Amino acid sequence: LKFERQTLRDVLNFHEVKWLEDPTNSDDSFERVRVRKLLTSFAELGLDKTKISKTASLMQSAKTALNHFAVDCYEKFGSCMYGDIIFDFEEFSNLPLDIKRRLLAAAQQWVSSQKYRPRLSQIDALLDSINEKTAFSGSGTICYSHDKSIKITRELNSCVNEIEAVNGLIFDNRWELSTSANCTEFTVKCLGENGLNFLDANVRKEIPYKTIIALPALFKDSALIDFPFLNPQSK
């Protein structure tokens, strides 16, 4: 908004930089084109590009401040364990609505390794489920209440199926495999129900069910070889 398109063209021409005009810039089927044409009408009403640009700048400044506060809140009563993002339920409940939304959106985006944050409608649905203390599935994550806390964990059905046990490979865009030798006869995949059956009943209780089944483990065919978060004990 700070610069006219013609100004940008002039700069490119001055520096003899080749450029192409985007043909969609004159296509009214695109919202941005229709909005750009409306700016002329807005200017006649006193709402010119300078004022809109200033408003956008103020909104960006407010966004930066809110994000800073959200980070501060996470550092005070948030944590990360077994790849889950965890919030204290009571502390989270006392936050302003906007900060709750920012924390949940960031948590879902981080846990799922998605490029874009979830839609606002999904975050609000997630907030409703938190207030009702029911589980919520969305954006490849599951959010649920556990021991006076809110947990955002990876959804098992959204995880990558499996990868070969090769040093340096990344599983599910989250976990890096570190091994002294490549073991291509082994695979890395989520622990799942099958792997869970290899663990002693008392050991399973150390990690919540929804979390543990989506954690990576080392398998040979269907047999659990290693689960780095616990010491598996064969039945």
Q: Where in this protein do the model-derived segments appear?
A:
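Catalytic subdomain that performs nucleotidyl-dependent activation
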Residues: 1-56, 88-90
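AMP-forming adenylation/ATP pyrophosphatase catalytic core
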Residues: 45, 56-235
